[in-house]
Amino acid sequence: MKLKFCGFTSIEDVTAASQLPIDAIGFIHYEKSKSHQTITQIKKLASAVPEHIDKVCVVVNPDLTTIEHVLSNTPINTIQLHGTESIDFIQEIKKKYSSIKITKALAADENIIQNINKYKGFVDLFIIDTPSVSYGGTGQTYDWTILKHIKDIPYLIAGGINSENIQTVNQLKLSHQGFDLASGIEVNGRKDIEKMTAIVNIVKGDRENE
């Protein structure tokens, strides 16, 4: 099972998370988000992430210039698109930056299968999140059984995941590859090492001991 921890805003939190066996650390470049970081801030934070952990920049309906600025000025190796980006736009990114991974966030709504089929040939991974007009970051969960119809597609579950409900998700026997957490590993807006460690022990510990 993969783990992505997202919404980092401090070097201390990045350093603490980087000591754990996680797969990706995310930074948000979207001014309407409470966790928004400038490209300069992302450069500093992402530079503290070890080589073996993916460095993800979350953007919402960006233009190509924004993508270029992120990739030219930071160690980011994955772009997470969280808006209504077109296939043409994704292909533009891929053409210019062939080694960059593209993740597409989708809402867990009645159009989820249709949207997966639309994007699946063009992205490396999906994040399936709680439906929201604010493009994620709600801290709210959704009915995970909607994901039972999704097979043979690489995706992470996001949206209000925490150490209390993550076992419930795993009991559903879905085909997800892992989880993407932000508010579920926070206390008072900062990442909490105890919460992060608890999630790692549940997701990685159990799996590794099977």
Swiss-Prot record:
GO BP, one annotated term: L-tryptophan biosynthetic process
Keywords per UniProt: Amino-acid biosynthesis, Aromatic amino acid biosynthesis, Isomerase, Tryptophan biosynthesis
Pathway it works in: Amino-acid biosynthesis; L-tryptophan biosynthesis; L-tryptophan from chorismate: step 3/5
UniProt catalytic activity: N-(5-phospho-beta-D-ribosyl)anthranilate = 1-(2-carboxyphenylamino)-1-deoxy-D-ribulose 5-phosphate
Pfam families xref list: PRAI (PF00697)
Family indicated by similarity: Belongs to the TrpF family.
Protein name as annotated: N-(5'-phosphoribosyl)anthranilate isomerase
Lineage: Bacteria, Bacillati, Bacillota, Bacilli, Bacillales
Gene: trpF
